[in-house]
Amino acid sequence: LTILIGINDTWRRFDSNVISKPEDFKACYKRILDKTLEKLSPTLVLMDPFVLPVPEDRRMWREDLDARINIVRELAKEYKAFYVPLDGLFHQAAATTPYEYWCPDGVHPTLAGHGLIAKAWLETVLGK
């Protein structure tokens, strides 16, 4: 079971002033994981939310998103899940290629962005 959540909480803060506290995000994420594990025995793959600075105002999203990324990292350890560090991977990829190539709005991946995610997932989970 692969989970990638968190960026919409950040987005709502900046477009609608709907604030989701990091501790609430963590509690909700843990409920999702716990309820899933009560019913199933999946291999868990947690991917951190990400944002690229496109448009430029996305830079200020870091103040909200970084806490969520840290929470996902902590939960991956706590639940012994595979962890795919998408935020770092996208920023690393964007060091040599324009941000828009990966995510034209900083959040929603292009075909190339989806390819980056798929490659990272395969390398993390299957070692390929």
Regions found by a protein language model. Give the residues of each.
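Alpha-helical cap/lid subdomain in secreted, periplasmic
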Residues: 1-128
